[in-house]
Curated annotation (Swiss-Prot):
Regions of compositional bias (Low complexity) in chain numbering: 364-375
Keywords, sorted A to Z: DNA damage, DNA repair
Protein name: DNA mismatch repair protein MutL
Name of the coding gene: mutL
Pfam family membership, one: DNA_mis_repair
Length: 619
C-alpha cells in the first residue's frame, strides 16, 4: 500500500481514540472549555448515560462567528500561540483537538454568541472532509454544545461502552472533580430530564466546607483537617482526613489538583501516602482533597493524552514540600502536648567512643525519648506521631526465623579492634575494654518497650527507650570532628524574639558542631541544615523548643545541647520487635561500651526469679 495522507475524518477518529474514551471524557473536555471561556454557570444534560445526548450550556464569553469553523478544526485553539505560551500554560485546554475529535465520532452541534454580537450562530461538521456549515440561531451570550449519538460511526467503540448507569456514574464523578476544583462556578447535572446534582457557586470558607460536605460526604468533612502550606512559589491547601479515622469508604476520596487541573499523579500520591503511612495500616489509603499551586514554568502538563498526569521540573522539591505540608497538619492534630518536667541531667557520653564504634551510626536515623517526662511529643518524619501501645498484654512471641537469623549474625560478629588511647584519654575516660562485652541474649519483648535479657546466667529487664536515648546522644555529641550537617531541601524559617536571637548567636559554634546550621536576620531565623537523626523529626516543633531551651541557658556546651536534644526526640518504635531490639543493643554495645560495663539503674534492672522458682517448688 502506498504512502498517502489520511482523510480528515479518519485522522480525527484516530485522534479521538486518545481523547474520547467514553462519554465522561466528552463531558470533561467540553466543561473544561466552558471554564476556560470564563463561565460561572454550566448546565450539563445527559440522556442514556451520554450515548444518546450530551449537552453542555454555559454563560462564558462565547465564540465569534468568524471563528466557529476554526473551532471545529484540528489544532485550532485560542489558548496558545507560541512555545513560550505552552511552557507557561494556565488554561485547562490547549491542544485544539477535542472538538474535532468529538465531532468525528458523533453528531456535534456548536451554538455560540458573544456579547458584541446581536445574534448567535450555529456550526456543525459533516462529510468525509468534515466541512463546517454555519447558520444563524437563537441563543443567549455563551455557548451550547450538543453531542448526539456518540460513536454512531464507530461500532467497535460503541460495543465497549458499559451500561447506562455505569457511564453516568463516570460522568457524575467527573462533575464532582470539577466542582471541587472550581467553587466559584455553579454546576447543574441532569440525567434523562431529571436534575441529579446542583452545585451552587460559593465564595466564603464556611460555604466551601458545606459544598465540600455535599461533594465528599459528611464523614469526610467531620474528619477533614485544613492544610495551608506555602514555600516560595509553592502553595498547598485543602483538606486531608484524620488517618486514625480513615475508613475504606473515605479512602475512595483522593482528589488532587495542580494549578486547578485535576490530576492522578503518582509523585503527589506517594508524598501524601508517605506522610500518612505511620497512622495507616498496610491495607488502608489516605483520604484527601488537595490543591497544589506552582509556577507554570516549573511543570509540564503536555505529557499525557488526557492531561491526567504532569511532570515537575523539580520533582523532589515538590514531593518533600507536599510531604512536609501534610505531615505538619497531621502532627498538630494528632499529637497532644505533654506537660513539661524537669529531668535529671544525664552524664555526658565520652566522644572517644565514636572512634571505638568503628562505624557511622548517622546512617540509622532513629531517635529516643525518656518515657518519664518528655518535653517534645511530635514528629514530622514518616515514623512520627504514633500513639503509645498498650503495655503488658502485647508481649512479643518468641523468635521468628528472620529475627533469629539477625541475632545469630550479630553473635558471630567479631569484636572490633580497640584503638590505642592517649595517656590523658586513659585517665579521663573509662576503659573501652567493655566494648567486647554485651548485654546478653534477648529473650523476648515485654510491655512494648522493654527487652528481657539473659546475661551471665541471670535475667534482666532493659528499657529500650533509655538505650535508644543514650545511642542518640552519642550520635549527636561531636567527637574530634563536628557532626555532619544534612542540608534541608526546604529551609525552616521561624520568627524569634530578641532574647532568643541573642541566645542563638551565642550558641552558634556548638550548634554548628552538632550539625545545626542557621542564618538570622532582624526578626527571623532560617534553619538550613540539621544532623541526620533530626531529619525525621517535626522540626517546626522541636526547633522552637530548642530555641526556648537555649534562651534559658547562660553557658552553651555542645554536649549539654546534644543531651537535651536526645531527651526530646520522638522514638520511632511504639512497639518494639525482637529484630529492632537486637539491632539497637548491638549499636549501643559498639558506640556506648561503658554502658555495658556499668549500666545505670534506669537502663538495666535485674529480675529476681529465684524467689518465684522457690515458691513453685512448694508442694
Amino acid at each position: 500500500m502506498p504512502i498517502q495522507v489520511l482523510p480528515p475524518q479518519l485522522a480525527n477518529q484516530i485522534a479521538a481514540g486518545e481523547v474520547v474514551e467514553r462519554p465522561a471524557s466528552v463531558v470533561k473536555e467540553l466543561v473544561e472549555n466552558s471554564l476556560d471561556a470564563g463561565a460561572t454557570r454550566i448546565d450539563i444534560d445527559i440522556e442514556r448515560g451520554g450515548a444518546k445526548l450530551i449537552r453542555i450550556r454555559d454563560n462564558g464569553c462565547g465564540i465569534k462567528k468568524d471563528e466557529l469553523a476554526l473551532a471545529l478544526a484540528r489544532h485550532a485553539t485560542s489558548k496558545i500561540a507560541s512555545l513560550d505560551d505552552l511552557e507557561a500554560i494556565i488554561s485547562l485546554g490547549f491542544r485544539g483537538e477535542a472538538l474535532a475529535s468529538i465531532s468525528s465520532v458523533s453528531r456535534l452541534t456548536l451554538t455560540s454568541r458573544t456579547a458584541e454580537q446581536a445574534e448567535a450562530w450555529q456550526a456543525y461538521a459533516e462529510g468525509r472532509d468534515m466541512d463546517v456549515t454555519v447558520k444563524p440561531a437563537a441563543h443567549p451570550v455563551g455557548t451550547t454544545l450538543e453531542v448526539l449519538d456518540l460513536f454512531y460511526n464507530t461500532p467497535a467503540r460503541r460495543k465497549f461502552m458499559r451500561t447506562e448507569k455505569t457511564e453516568f456514574n463516570h460522568i457524575d464523578e467527573i462533575i464532582r472533580r470539577i466542582a471541587l476544583a472550581r467553587f466559584d462556578v455553579t454546576l447543574n447535572l441532569s440525567h434523562n430530564g431529571k436534575m441529579v446534582r446542583q452545585y451552587r457557586a460559593v465564595a466564603q470558607d464556611g460555604q466551601k466546607e458545606r459544598r465540600l460536605g455535599a461533594l465528599c460526604g459528611a464523614p469526610f468533612l467531620e474528619q477533614a483537617l485544613v492544610i495551608e502550606w506555602q514555600h516560595g512559589d509553592l502553595t498547598l491547601r485543602g483538606w486531608v482526613a484524620d488517618p486514625h479515622h480513615t475508613t475504606a469508604a473515605l479512602a475512595e476520596i483522593q482528589y488532587c489538583y495542580v494549578n486547578g487541573r485535576m490530576m492522578r499523579d503518582r509523585l503527589i500520591n506517594h508524598a501524601i501516602r508517605q506522610a500518612c503511612e505511620d497512622k495507616l495500616g498496610g491495607d488502608r489509603q489516605p483520604a484527601f482533597v488537595l490543591y497544589l499551586e506552582i509556577d507554570p514554568h516549573q511543570v509540564d502538563v503536555n505529557v499525557h493524552p488526557a492531561k491526567h498526569e504532569v511532570r515537575f521540573h523539580q520533582s523532589r522539591l515538590v514531593h518533600d514540600f507536599i510531604y512536609q505540608g501534610v505531615l505538619s497538619v497531621l502532627q498538630q492534630q494528632l499529637d497532644a502536648p505533654l506537660p513539661l518536667a524537669e529531668e535529671a541531667p544525664a552524664p555526658r557520653h565520652i566522644p572517644e567512643n565514636r572512634v571505638a564504634a568503628g562505624r557511622n551510626h548517622f546512617a540509622e536515623p532513629a531517635s529516643a525519648r525518656e518515657p518519664a517526662a518528655p518535653r517534645y511529643s511530635t514528629s514530622s518524619g514518616a515514623t512520627g506521631g504514633r500513639q503509645p501501645a498498650a503495655s503488658w498484654p502485647h508481649a512479643q512471641p518468641g523468635y521468628q526465623k528472620q529475627q533469629g537469623e539477625v541475632y545469630r549474625q550479630l553473635l558471630q560478629t567479631p569484636a572490633p579492634r580497640q584503638p590505642a588511647l592517649a595517656p590523658e584519654a586513659e585517665t579521663a575516660a573509662p576503659s573501652l575494654a567493655g566494648h567486647s562485652q554485651s548485654f546478653g541474649r534477648v529473650l523476648t519483648i515485654v510491655g512494648a518497650d522493654c527487652a528481657l535479657l539473659e546475661r551471665d546466667g541471670n535475667i534482666h529487664l532493659l528499657a529500650l527507650p533509655v538505650a535508644e536515648r543514650w545511642l542518640r546522644q552519642a550520635q549527636l555529641t561531636p567527637g574530634q570532628t563536628p557532626v555532619c550537617a544534612q542540608p534541608l531541601l526546604i529551609p525552616l524559617r521561624l520568627k524569634v524574639s530578641a532574647e532568643e536571637k541573642s541566645a542563638l548567636e551565642k550558641a552558634q559554634t556548638p550548634l554548628t558542631d552538632l550539625g545545626i546550621e542557621f542564618q538570622s536576620d532582624a526578626q527571623h531565623v532560617t534553619i538550613r541544615a540539621v544532623p541526620l537523626p533530626l531529619r525525621q523529626q517535626n522540626l517546626q516543633i522541636l526547633i522552637p523548643e530548642l530555641i526556648g531551651y537555649l534562651a534559658q541557658q547562660s553557658a552553651f556546651d555542645a554536649g549539654n545541647i546534644a543531651q537535651w536534644i536526645a531527651r526530646n526526640l520522638m522514638s520511632e518504635h511504639p512497639q518494639w520487635t525482637m529484630a529492632q531490639a537486637i539491632t539497637l543493643l548491638a549499636d549501643v554495645e559498639r558506640l556506648c561500651p561503658q554502658l555495658v560495663k556499668a549500666p545505670p539503674g534506669g537502663l538495666l534492672q535485674p529480675v529476681d526469679l529465684h524467689s518465684v522458682m522457690n515458691a513453685l517448688k512448694h508442694e
